[in-house]
């Protein structure tokens, strides 16, 4: 009968896969100078990403082709935001320059992913509405991953210079 050689063209032509993705990304900034030397600034960035994958591989009736149907569905949802707010004061007195900054940052991210894989569907045709559980034997157990991360940081910086020749800076950050 000869060697079992895979036909990659047949595999590509019979595989059905869709992966629509929706993504929203936005950055908003606000800055105000209420009095001379003082600047208040806030930046907010949000990122939302939703990806849904649906793939189906039918039986491929060629040498080396797939002998069973395979279906995979995956859903991933990610939400991330970063918020930074600072107050900065700077003033010059003759040859003396002073500056001070204080603020906080908030960083948050949440991800949820789940997927299902089955094989041995009764039909060789792909139907996106076909029940993933219908008459298929489990290829592997469904999986779910959940990740959540949050961090708040407080920060401050003091600066001094004399005659633009001598500089002193101190900073601190607490997460």
Over which residues does each language-model region extend?
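Outer-membrane beta-barrel transmembrane strands
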Residues: 8-47, 51-55, 72-92, 99, ...
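Extended hydrophobic secondary-structure segments that form protein cores and membrane-embedded regions
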Residues: 99-105
């Amino acid at each position: 009968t000869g060697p079992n050689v895979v036909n990659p063209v047949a595999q590509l032509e019979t595989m059905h896969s869709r992966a629509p993705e929706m993504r929203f990304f936005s950055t908003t900034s606000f800055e105000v100078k209420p009095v001379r030397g003082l600047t208040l600034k806030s930046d907010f960035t949000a990122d939302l990403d939703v990806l849904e994958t649906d793939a189906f591989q039918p039986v491929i009736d060629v040498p080396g082709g797939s002998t069973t149907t395979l279906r995979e569905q995956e859903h991933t949802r990610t939400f991330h935001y970063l918020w930074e707010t600072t107050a900065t004061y700077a003033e010059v007195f003759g040859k003396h320059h002073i500056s001070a900054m204080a603020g906080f940052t908030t960083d948050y991210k949440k991800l949820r992913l789940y997927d299902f894989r089955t094989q041995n569907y009764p039909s060789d045709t792909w139907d996106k509405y076909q029940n993933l559980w219908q008459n298929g034997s489990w290829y592997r157990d469904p999986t779910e991953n959940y990740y959540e991360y949050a961090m708040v940081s407080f920060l401050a910086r003091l600066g001094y210079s004399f005659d633009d020749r001598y500089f002193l800076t101190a900073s601190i950050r607490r997460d």
